[in-house]
Amino acid sequence: MKWNEELDAQSDHPLVPGVIVVLDLDKFKEYVRERGLDPYRPNIVTGELTEAVEELARRYRGVVVYGFSRERGTEEAIIEIPYLEDVNSLVKYLEEVSERIKSYGASISIVVLRDFITGKPARNRREAYYATPARRRAIKLLKEIKRKGGGRILVLT
């Protein structure tokens, strides 16, 4: 049995090579509280991130696995991009997004990981975070970045 066949056996969907992007605003509850913002409505930061995630998915033919919300604003998201070979322009785009988020006084942590992905939306948060080895690894890396203060882009290809 080939390695990716073994991975397929652990997933509801076949796995293909690609890139997973996991992003999360840092200490955002504090940001919202300090500024007296409504946590259930879009604000300048979550609106910016919503637009950025939508543009990323469109530009790179990615699939938003989890987290995109026009109604509340996007605070976190998981995007999978099947068969993406060159991540340089993706990383440059994510650096621009990070700078825009910083311009509002917030910060964001981002993981870009080349691995085997499903390229399918998740039914719930648990599936989004843990359905595949790549998602589990990306979430673990994101938590490590955030524990160390956040505000970074980690790229593993």
State each model region's role.
Residues 1-157:
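Regulatory and interdomain segments flanking nucleotide-handling catalytic cores
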